[in-house]
Structure formats: C-alpha cells, structure tokens
Amino acid sequence: MVGKLITFEGPDGAGKTSALEAVVARLQKEVSQEIVVTREPGGNPISEQIRQIILDVKNTAMDDRTEALLYAAARRQHIVEKIQPALAADKLVICDRFVDSSIAYQGAGRGIGEEAVAQMNLFATDGLTPDLTLYLDVPSEVGLARIKQHRQNQYDRLDQEKLAFHQKVRQSYLKLAQAHPDRIKTIDASQPLEAVVTQCLQVIAQANLHLFEV
C-alpha cells in the first residue's frame, strides 16, 4: 500500500492553516491511517532553516528567482526526508502548501512565469503530485484585511506585498483549479470557519482516496 497526500492551498488570509488543523482533528477520529501533518516551506530542520531565510523581512534584496529556487530546495528536502517515507509507510500526509503555492506566488505574483516555476518544481519533486488539493479561496481584499486584523503587525516578507501582488496570486490559483478540476477542489473561505471545515471534510469523503474503509 502507498499512503495519500492531501494539500491545503490558498492566498494569505484565507484561514487555510486554521481550517487544516480543524480538519485534521476530525479526521484523526475517523480514519485508521496514521496522519502526518506538515507544512511548506519547512517540515524538517533543513527546510525550516530555508523558511526563515525566505520569510525574513530583512531580506529585501532577495532576487525573485532566488526566492523560487529556495522554495524548490526546501520542498525537495521535505519530500525526501519526510513526505516520501510517510507515503511509503501507508500514512496520510496532510501538507500546508505545496507546488501550487510556488506557481501562484513566484510564477504569477513575482512574474517569473508559471510554467518556468512548474518545471523547476517538477525537477524538485520528481513528479510527486497530491492526491487531493483543497484550495481555500477568498477575495484578496478580504484576505489582507484578515491579516491586518489577526497578525497584530507581525508580518512576514510576503504578507507585506501590495494588493496587486495578492490579486495575481489568487488569479493564478483559480486558473490552476480550472486546469486541474479532478485534483483541486475550491472551497469558499469567506464563510465562517466551521462551514469551511465541513465543506473540506465533505470533499475529502467524496474523493476516491479509500480513507474511510475498514
């Protein structure tokens, strides 16, 4: 048996991480597989160190391609060290962000090119693709307002980008969802958290992942 990989995606302020945590808490009561929860960039010591470099607000001189390459490097180490071993052990891996984030943020947001970033990550992942992606969608204005309200001036380097950047990111996500409807399922994240969580669980249950079989 081989485990399954579910990823959560969404623009900043979509409430993605809160939804993921609530979904995992429910799934742990309902599925027999061991669940491994992880995040990107990060998930292991090397990738967490790269994360600090990427998000450090002092690194204003970082080149856009450098940023994209750092994400890809962190992802590669994460896959080799954590994701692949978990999948090989028939575990359910739930990851906060994956390749779609790089395509949206660096490919579209930074303007490097979505296809260029996709190819870069094809090399980094060796073709590993999520079995299911939950895309939590929220208008950019709403997302940024939530960030301002909840993070109390504790912004990382990407949070500080202007509205136009975040709008490009969202449009790229929507395009990805349209291009990969079997894998990427869109959730309206402007709803209350409990409604978002319920919808996420429904999508997971309807996906042909065999998670709830005895």
Swiss-Prot record:
GO terms for molecular function: ATP binding; dTMP kinase activity. It catalyses: dTMP + ATP = dTDP + ADP. GO terms for cellular component: cytosol. The keyword Ribosomal protein does not apply. Keywords: ATP-binding, Kinase, Nucleotide biosynthesis, Nucleotide-binding, Transferase. The keyword ATP-binding applies. ATP binds at G10, P11, D12, G13, A14, G15, K16, T17. Its EC number is 2.7.4.9. One of its GO terms (biological process) is dTTP biosynthetic process. PANTHER family: THYMIDYLATE KINASE, UMP-CMP KINASE 2, MITOCHONDRIAL. Phosphorylation of dTMP to form dTDP in both de novo and salvage pathways of dTTP synthesis. This is Thymidylate kinase. It comes from Latilactobacillus sakei subsp. sakei (strain 23K) (Lactobacillus sakei subsp. sakei). The lineage of its organism: Bacteria, Bacillati, Bacillota, Bacilli, Lactobacillales.
